């Protein structure tokens, strides 16, 4: 029994190391690609030529751009026009920082424009990955379709999600998540990053270890979903895992 336990522990350690190596390979010399697109292409082109290309939209005064992602027919990214690496940035808990999740929700209309018809709100999800769950070191929120199985699970747990951060029953995609219900008025007034930092014990000191997602519910409320990195369970806190960039939910 002791040998079996030791073997299991060794396997876990190997898996954790492999996950770490994989992460560093993914975040090598190309990890600044999105930042270069925003700061060296989209922003200058908008300022000099009033043309957001290659972005779909550039709002210098509001501090963000929207870019069509190369993965998936309808996936877009919302990014700041200045340097923010990701969820670990203290700027995200500064009240003067734009409410990027609310801005990303407004940008969902780009999905409908690309699709050629309205994409139902129930099919849309927003997600940002943790520091170890991302491949780019420029803050970006994924605007894309939700996985049908995640949509069903959230629908089935509508009554179980409260206005406090509580464990999502059964987790999502094999990982533990905290879920919190928010109204639209709450979301307009306060960033989900601030809600997480201020309401979940010790979250403020470890924001970079969290991935965060947002989905609209059938009662017109929103549910925030937060997952924290735990390499022992092979969870890199990539909240993007709740999304389906091929948009099966629309078929």
From Swiss-Prot:
Keywords, in A-Z order: Cell inner membrane, Cell membrane, Hydrolase, Lipid biosynthesis, Lipid metabolism, Membrane, Phospholipid biosynthesis, Phospholipid metabolism, Transmembrane, Transmembrane helix
Chief place of localization: membrane
Reaction catalysis annotation: a CDP-1,2-diacyl-sn-glycerol + H2O = a 1,2-diacyl-sn-glycero-3-phosphate + CMP + 2 H(+)
Pfam family, one: CDH
Bilayer topology: Single-pass membrane protein
The EC number(s) this enzyme carries: 3.6.1.26
Pathway: Phospholipid metabolism; CDP-diacylglycerol degradation; phosphatidate from CDP-diacylglycerol: step 1/1
Subcellular locations according to the entry: Cell inner membrane
Domain of life assignment: Bacteria
Root EC class: hydrolase
One GO cellular component term: plasma membrane
Family: Belongs to the Cdh family.
This protein's name: CDP-diacylglycerol pyrophosphatase
Species assigned in the record: Escherichia coli O81 (strain ED1a)
């Amino acid at each position: 029994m002791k040998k079996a336990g030791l073997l299991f522990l060794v396997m876990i350690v190997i898996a954790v190391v492999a996950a770490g190596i994989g992460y560093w390979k993914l975040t090598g010399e190309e990890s600044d690609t999105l930042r270069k697109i925003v700061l060296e292409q989209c922003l200058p082109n908008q300022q000099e030529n009033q043309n957001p290309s290659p972005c779909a939209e550039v709002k210098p005064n509001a501090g963000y751009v929207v870019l069509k992602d190369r993965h998936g027919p309808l996936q877009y990214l919302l990014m700041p026009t200045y340097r923010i690496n990701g969820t670990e940035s203290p700027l995200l808990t500064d009240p003067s920082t734009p409410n990027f999740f609310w801005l990303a929700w407004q940008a969902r209309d780009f999905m409908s424009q690309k699709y050629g018809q309205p994409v139902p709100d129930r099919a849309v999800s927003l997600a940002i990955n943790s520091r170890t769950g991302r491949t780019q070191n420029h803050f970006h929120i994924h605007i894309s379709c939700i996985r049908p199985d995640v949509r069903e699970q959230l629908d089935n747990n509508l009554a179980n999600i409260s206005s406090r951060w509580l464990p999502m029953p059964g987790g999502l995609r094999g990982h533990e998540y905290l879920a919190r219900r928010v109204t639209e008025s709450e979301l307009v007034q306060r960033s989900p990053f601030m809600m997480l930092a201020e309401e979940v014990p010790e979250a403020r000191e470890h924001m970079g270890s969290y991935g965060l997602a947002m989905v609209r519910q059938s009662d017109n409320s929103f549910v925030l979903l937060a997952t924290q990195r735990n390499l022992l369970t092979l969870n890199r806190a990539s909240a993007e895992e709740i999304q389906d960039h091929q948009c099966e939910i629309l078929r």
